[in-house]
UniProtKB/Swiss-Prot annotation:
SUPFAM superfamilies: Zn-binding ribosomal proteins. This is Large ribosomal subunit protein bL32. It comes from the Bacteria. Residues 1-28 are annotated as: Disordered. One of its GO terms (cellular component) is large ribosomal subunit.
Length: 60
């Protein structure tokens, strides 16, 4: 197995890790219940997508 010949510097390590940060999901507003939801997905609060009820939500 190959091993590193030299130690990587802190700058080189942090430069490589600069793109590893998690991005916040872009949320949109549900037109039916006005709760935040992920675009192009069923609303977890009311169960609607594109004006149709796709998932039946159980009331607690």
């Amino acid at each position: 197995m190959p091993n590193p010949k030299r130690r990587h510097s802190k700058k080189r390590t942090s430069t490589r890790r600069a793109h590893d940060a998690l991005k916040q999901p872009g949320l949109s507003e549900c037109p039916n219940c006005h709760e935040p939801k992920v675009p192009h997905r069923v609303c977890p609060h009311c169960g609607q997508y594109k004006g149709r009820e796709v998932v039946e939500v159980v009331a607690e």
